[in-house]
């Protein structure tokens, strides 16, 4: 199990997530070495789980609890659908210069393909947004998406999440519940990384 986890080492979350914090990763890795083998790390504000992922890769001996309050797992579980949809959108965007705004006609064609995908199941609107919308803008549903201009910012390769959550104990609850659950347990370290005050939290749950 440890060997498999070392094989998949992500420097950032595999799918777009508002508020990822990657700049402190190297210093965080150094701090993790200070704790004992029996330490339980509880990631209270899991987000897209980069902290949980780094912790488990650096400390495979430890227990790591990832609080997936935003249901990031659902997006990971549907990554093959997302890749297939993006592949179709890439084909539709052929001939359109990179970063150029799409015409109203192409806007309608793209929306129709996305609506068809939604009718058969799941659409990861946050990931689709990163390929279609102006930098920093995100839509949470088809209603929000159809009101915005589209740009050809298409990702040129598939997303991959293989092994990303390996070894983590995943829960989904209010962070206060986790604090209470482990309050009196020995060797517990809370990883507290809430969204920055300036972060757009409209995409959070």
Short names for language-model regions:
Residues 51-57, 75-79, 182, 199-204:
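A short acidic (Asp/Glu
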Residues 1-40, 50, 131:
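S-adenosyl-L-methionine
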Residues 25, 48-52, 178-180:
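Short, well-ordered alpha-helical microsegments
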Residues 33-37, 57, 120-122, 162-165, ...:
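Flexible, charged surface loops at secondary-structure boundaries
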Residues 41-54, 66-70, 131-133, 184-200:
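Conserved proline-anchored active-site loop of SAM-dependent methyltransferases
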Residues 62-165:
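Class I S-adenosyl-L-methionine-dependent methyltransferase module
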Residues 37-41, 62-63, 164-169:
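Short active-site oxyanion
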Residues 167-205:
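Active-site segment flanking the S-adenosylmethionine/decSAM binding pocket
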């Amino acid at each position: 199990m440890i060997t498999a986890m070392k094989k998949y080492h992500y420097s950032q979350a595999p799918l777009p997530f508002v508020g990822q914090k990657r700049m402190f990763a190297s210093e965080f890795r150094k701090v993790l070495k200070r704790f004992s083998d029996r330490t339980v790390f509880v990631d209270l504000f899991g987000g897209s789980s980069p902290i949980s992922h780094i912790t488990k890769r650096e400390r495979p001996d430890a227990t790591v609890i990832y609080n997936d309050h935003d249901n990031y797992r659902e997006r990971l579980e549907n990554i093959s659908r997302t890749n297939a949809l993006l592949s179709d959108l890439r084909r539709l965007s052929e001939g359109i210069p990179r970063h150029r705004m799409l015409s109203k006609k192409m806007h309608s064609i793209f929306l129709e393909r996305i609506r068809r995908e939604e009718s058969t199941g799941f659409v990861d609107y946050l990931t689709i947004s990163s390929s279609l919308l102006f930098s920093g803008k995100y839509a949470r549903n088809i209603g929000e998406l159809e009101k915005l201009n589209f740009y050809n910012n298409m990702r040129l390769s598939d997303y991959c999440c293989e092994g990303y959550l390996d070894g983590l104990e995943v829960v989904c609850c209010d962070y206060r519940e986790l604090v209470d659950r482990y309050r009196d347990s020995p060797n517990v370290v809370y990883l507290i990384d809430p969204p920055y005050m300036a972060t757009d939290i409209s995409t959070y749950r």
